[in-house]
């Protein structure tokens, strides 16, 4: 595993790197990187970070899950912290890159254990919509995020499920199929930010085509660059006429 920083590493090379880690160490649970098509769902997020947040900034991967986004942040040269209610296998690799990790307690579901005005950015990758499932709520979580952000710091929320997503609607009808209990629209996003004093900078829908379904296909299909490019282009085209039915929102807000 390379420990070079992303300053000299294009996003495509980073994706290849983390896919190789998943292939070599499958117990790390980096399931999103079992196929090139599914791995590409994060390219837009990587670009947002590189465009909005300067190198060496302090960034929190809030609800870091299996640690895949923390790995990107570290490779990109950010001072990276992670927070989760559970530890994860991949952390032993992240620790080689000066990673700070704090574990939360389920009896304090709303608390983020960092001091006021600590971070230049806090990122949620598919986390904010789950806080009610662990005894919290969106407003209290956003108030905590506001507290730990530096003045002018950014909250970047990615993979925030769209209320009218066709994928979510179908998934909810299939027994034992994963879907999100809580989904949102633009008005709800603005309301959440207004109630927590966060200034909305950008809101957009994305992701009309499914991605994770590719993970269990043969390697010759799921990791084919031509197929991946066709899928990416199709997804980009379809998001315009079918934006309302896209799977997710992303929004960027500032303290």
Q: PLM features: residue spans?
A:
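Conserved N-terminal segment of class I S-adenosyl-L-methionine
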Residues: 1-115, 121-125, 142, 246-249
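S-adenosyl-L-methionine-dependent methyltransferase catalytic module, highlighting the catalytic core
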Residues: 103, 132-144, 154-254
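Conserved short-loop catalytic and cofactor-binding motifs
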Residues: 33-34, 110, 129, 133, ...
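A short SAM/SAH-binding and catalytic strip from SAM-dependent methyltransferases
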Residues: 121-136
């Amino acid at each position: 595993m390379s420990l070079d920083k992303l300053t000299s590493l294009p996003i495509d090379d980073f994706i290849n790197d983390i896919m190789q880690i998943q292939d070599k160490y499958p117990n790390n649970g980096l399931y999103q990187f079992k196929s090139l098509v599914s791995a590409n769902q994060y390219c837009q997020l990587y670009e947002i970070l590189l465009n909005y947040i300067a190198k060496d900034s302090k960034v929190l991967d809030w609800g870091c899950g299996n640690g895949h986004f923390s790995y990107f942040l570290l490779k990109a040269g950010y001072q990276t912290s992670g927070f989760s209610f559970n530890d994860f296998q991949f952390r032993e690799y992240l620790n080689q890159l000066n990673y700070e990790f704090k574990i939360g307690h389920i009896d304090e579901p709303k608390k983020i254990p960092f001091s006021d005005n600590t971070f230049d950015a806090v990122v949620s990758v598919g986390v904010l919509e789950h806080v009610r499932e662990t005894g919290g709520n969106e407003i209290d979580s956003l108030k905590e995020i506001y507290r730990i952000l530096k003045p002018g710091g950014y909250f970047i929320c990615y993979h925030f499920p769209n209320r009218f997503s066709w994928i979510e609607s179908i998934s909810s009808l299939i027994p034992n199929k994963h879907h999100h209990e809580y989904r949102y629209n633009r008005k709800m996003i603005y309301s959440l930010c207004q109630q927590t004093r966060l200034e909305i900078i950008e809101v957009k829908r994305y992701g009309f085509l499914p991605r994770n379904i590719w993970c269990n296909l043969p390697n010759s299909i799921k990791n084919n660059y031509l197929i991946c490019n066709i899928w990416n282009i199709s997804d980009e085209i379809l998001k315009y006429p079918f934006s309302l039915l896209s799977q997710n929102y992303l929004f960027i807000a500032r303290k």
